[in-house]
């Protein structure tokens, strides 16, 4: 919960962020928590919930929403709660959920879908006043049996002016947090921790005017990934701590993405520092900035791949990528010769234009050389060709045999030394206070005040 003074400071910081980044307007709830509490507080304990991890809290939350969903705060006090009935809250206005307890998925339920879904409406906030609230999905109970088509944890859909902050999402049976066609939102001060397997995405996001910052993700798939239909995003201070890494896609027919900034992204022992992935399709991706990236121990680094083999080819001449800048990248990857540290692969029928690779200094951890691969990509830097007016297609590989100056980069104290498996319970993490070397989080943890 933010004080009035802090709200003013946050607004000033947001103004700075809007000027420096790609946000198109204000983000977050329209009214404060104190204003919402002044209307009404609905304690789930008064609606039949008990914090004994035995009695379903899902229905009490939905019953509390009937009284507080048009103005007020649904309060889930400290303690352990069992969820059996999935929560679906639709078209609420001027309400919040204060999750100070921990919600555990009932391990015997076979329900699919989203455990916690908020759809429609506006002026919404999900937060923990102690920064200790969490949703524990106990996904390992599925994964240990080889099941990965399973419930998801949190879904924000078609909501305007909202925020999610100061909570942890843990061990999702499938995806952790999906933001779908939402607008004017803010996500911050979160820890997401999942099993070491594909399909356990951290944050997947689409919509307009969304600020995601100060988030740590551990899993084996998407860290913070932008989907088609995304515009005016600012994503910064992201800690992919043994993850799949951040990405865009996969993109197919009718792709429409513009005005996206990723800044201050730290990636440790993940699949990639950043990947844009498509295979065929059509549409346009434009006006992207990827600035201040640090990586260590990753399989791939800078990877724009319009021939991504992990997806089926989609009908179309390929997506048109234009005006994309990669700037100030440092660090290492595991094997820069067998997996190029810079790879920009663009469609033959729709070459990429206005691509800039500037101060991208990466080096291999194995061997003594690395490669850059470019195909049908025009701009400046690395192996890119400069003449986009040419109709000739091309493909080139450049071998680098000496480490670039300035590639060395710091590590983070919380870098994991091993992954979390898929056959045992995953502990709930403490939300960190640092998400990128030298960068101060925009908002102090709610529990620190």
From Swiss-Prot:
Please name the InterPro entries in this protein's record: Glyco_hydro_28, Pectin_lyas_fold, Pectin_lyase_fold/virulence
All disulfide bonds of the chain are 42-68, 223-240, 346-352, 374-383
Where is this gene product found?
Answer: Secreted
Give the UniProt record's GO annotations in the biological process aspect.
cell wall organization; polysaccharide catabolic process
One CC-aspect GO term: extracellular region
Positions bearing carbohydrate? 53, 91, 106, 241, 256, 323
Give the annotated active site: 221 (proton donor), 296
Annotated EC: 3.2.1.171
MF terms (GO), sorted A to Z: polygalacturonase activity; rhamnogalacturonan alpha-L-rhamnopyranosyl-(1->4)-alpha-D-galactopyranosyluronide lyase activity
Return the broad EC class.
hydrolase
**Record's keyword terms, sorted:** Carbohydrate metabolism, Cell wall biogenesis/degradation, Disulfide bond, Glycoprotein, Glycosidase, Hydrolase, Polysaccharide degradation, Secreted, Signal
Signal sequence, renumbered to the chain: 1-21
Query: Which reactions appear under catalytic activity for this entry?
Result: Endohydrolysis of alpha-D-GalA-(1->2)-alpha-L-Rha glycosidic bond in the rhamnogalacturonan I backbone with initial inversion of anomeric configuration releasing oligosaccharides with beta-D-GalA at the reducing end
Has the keyword rRNA-binding been applied to this entry? no
What protein family is recorded?
Answer: Belongs to the glycosyl hydrolase 28 family.
Q: What does this protein do?
A: Pectinolytic enzymes consist of four classes of enzymes: pectine lyase, polygalacturonase, pectin methylesterase and rhamnogalacturonase. Hydrolyzes alpha-D-galacturonopyranosyl-(1,2)-alpha-L-rhamnopyranosyl linkages in the backbone of the hairy regions of pectins.
Name the UniProt record assigns to this protein: Probable rhamnogalacturonase E
UniProt source species:
Aspergillus flavus (strain ATCC 200026 / FGSC A1120 / IAM 13836 / NRRL 3357 / JCM 12722 / SRRC 167)
